[in-house]
């Protein structure tokens, strides 16, 4: 009975690490999609002439 509890505890730790890795990968994927979408939007607006220009004032 004690060996079963130890095995269940080890399995729980493995599943927790797996869950953490999946959450971390999903977070990076969402960040990448948002960042890529913003870059695409900015590039599209610049191609349409609606971009921004930087005016340097001395």
Curated annotation (Swiss-Prot):
It is found in: Membrane. Keywords: Membrane, Transmembrane, Transmembrane helix. The keyword Transmembrane applies. One of its GO terms (cellular component) is membrane. Its main location: membrane. It is a single-pass membrane protein. The chain crosses the membrane at residues 20-42. It comes from the Archaea. This is Uncharacterized protein AF_1597. It comes from Archaeoglobus fulgidus (strain ATCC 49558 / DSM 4304 / JCM 9628 / NBRC 100126 / VC-16). The lineage of its organism: Archaea, Methanobacteriati, Methanobacteriota, Archaeoglobi, Archaeoglobales.
């Amino acid at each position: 009975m004690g060996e079963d509890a130890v095995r269940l505890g080890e399995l729980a730790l493995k599943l927790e690490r797996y869950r953490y890795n999946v959450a971390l990968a999903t977070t990076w994927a969402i960040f990448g999609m948002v960042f890529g979408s913003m870059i695409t939007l900015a590039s599209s607006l610049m191609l349409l002439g609606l971009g921004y220009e930087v005016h340097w004032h001395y």
